[in-house]
Amino acid sequence: MIIAIDGPAASGKGTLARRLAQHFNLPHLDTGLLYRATARALLVSGGDLQNHAEATAAARGLDVASLEAANLRSDEIGQAASIVAAIPDVRAALKDLQRRFAGTPGGAVLDGRDIGTVICPDADVKIFVTASLQARAARRAAELQGRGEPGDLAVVQEEIRQRDERDANRPVAPFRAAADATFLDTTDLDIEAAFEAALAIVDNRIRKLAS
């Protein structure tokens, strides 16, 4: 069983993906970390985030161990990742890696921004997780503050808005929901309520596939 979870920044998709993977005992891949690790490699080496050749080389040479880097989830890396993710050759370089993971015997859970549309268009379950811009900004600001990083709400909200715009307008694999995805709005849901709602979506899909 392949479960594809897509959604914008701070919608809660990563948390839901991890919980579902644990529940169904499936491997989980946060595909956003691939782009974050690519961006981090460029920043560390002094490369240019908008140089297509440099970014593509970083993606092709990605070391899976780098996905464990402590600062991958920083806001700076997140913004940089959104820039390299708009480069077609970077997406192509990382696509095969993601598809190989999705082909894990028994299934897998992947979350990102183009899982249900590009990486796993035939996924058994597709969930598009969303939330209001204000709710997502509040969550991200709280997350940053919890790590001791600057988390000014207005700044965070504008950064998320800009990232949404970049992702939606990139030339390759623009961010959008799959036509057959089930929407889950987490604006007014806590983690447990969101998980229960996601679990209900998956269970319902399993029943339909079995019938």
Curated annotation (Swiss-Prot):
Its EC number is 2.7.4.25. Residues 158-169 have a biased composition (Basic and acidic residues). Keywords: ATP-binding, Cytoplasm, Kinase, Nucleotide-binding, Transferase. Signal peptide: none annotated. GO terms for molecular function: ATP binding; CMP kinase activity; dCMP kinase activity. Disulfide bonds: none annotated. Residues 153-172 are annotated as: Disordered. One of its GO terms (cellular component) is cytoplasm. Gene3D superfamilies: P-loop containing nucleotide triphosphate hydrolases. It is found in: Cytoplasm. SUPFAM superfamilies: P-loop containing nucleoside triphosphate hydrolases. It catalyses: CMP + ATP = CDP + ADP; dCMP + ATP = dCDP + ADP. It is an enzyme of class 2 (transferase). Belongs to the cytidylate kinase family. Type 1 subfamily. This is Cytidylate kinase. The lineage of its organism: Bacteria, Pseudomonadati, Pseudomonadota, Alphaproteobacteria, Hyphomicrobiales. The gene is cmk.
